[in-house]
Amino acid sequence: KLSKAHEAQLKLKNRRLYQQRLAVDAIALIVNNKNALDELSISELRNILLGETKNWNEIEPSKLKQIQVVFDHKHSSIVKYMVDSITGGKPFAGEVYAQQSTRDVIDKVSKNKNTIGLIGVSWITPDLRGRNKSAAEYYQELQKNDTTTLDFNDNIKVLKIRRDDYPIAFKPYQAYIFSGEYPLYRSIYVATTAARGSLPHGFLTFLTGYVGQKIIQNTGVLPAAIQPRMVQVN
């Protein structure tokens, strides 16, 4: 969402701003499958990012060594979110490393049992295994109302996260992101100053309409206008 300062600049230029909430993205924490840890609290995550918790055995009994944190790149929006929302404005400290891409983060975690990775939840899809869907498959998925199923890489697992004031931890399933029970989420907005009836404004209308929102839902990101539902799989 544009800041108040940006909105003021547009107003000075007599530009009318059209801005709408498009989706809700979540940040997933991934670890190597050889790591026995299944969940983290927000305060435990904060202590890791600030370098106050340095080793895995400080969280629970473990033979693993020093914690290494990896994220996609040095200008990452994930880092900005973590600093703004988790560390209280304090910069990362300790063994924290920027990679070149999210794919590099996934590869690093899959090969290093001491590493924890920060990635966008939209990366946790069947495409993680390199599976290419046909146009027909995508069309069939658009007709479904089911919450996107998380398909995890064999070498990594996604941690559950819990709030400090709540005893239950949650994975980043769409329903839990929607309810706010999964705490690591952020809103995505679409904005334009183009006039109504123009191509850019039409694209905004498409993105926030039913078809656009269904497409967003199938990327693994939670659309703003479509309420997810949980489906039990036995």
Predicted regions and their residues:
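Glycine-rich phosphate-binding active-site loops on the catalytic face of alpha/beta enzymes
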Residues: 2
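Exported/periplasmic ABC-transporter solute-binding proteins
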Residues: 8-25, 30-234
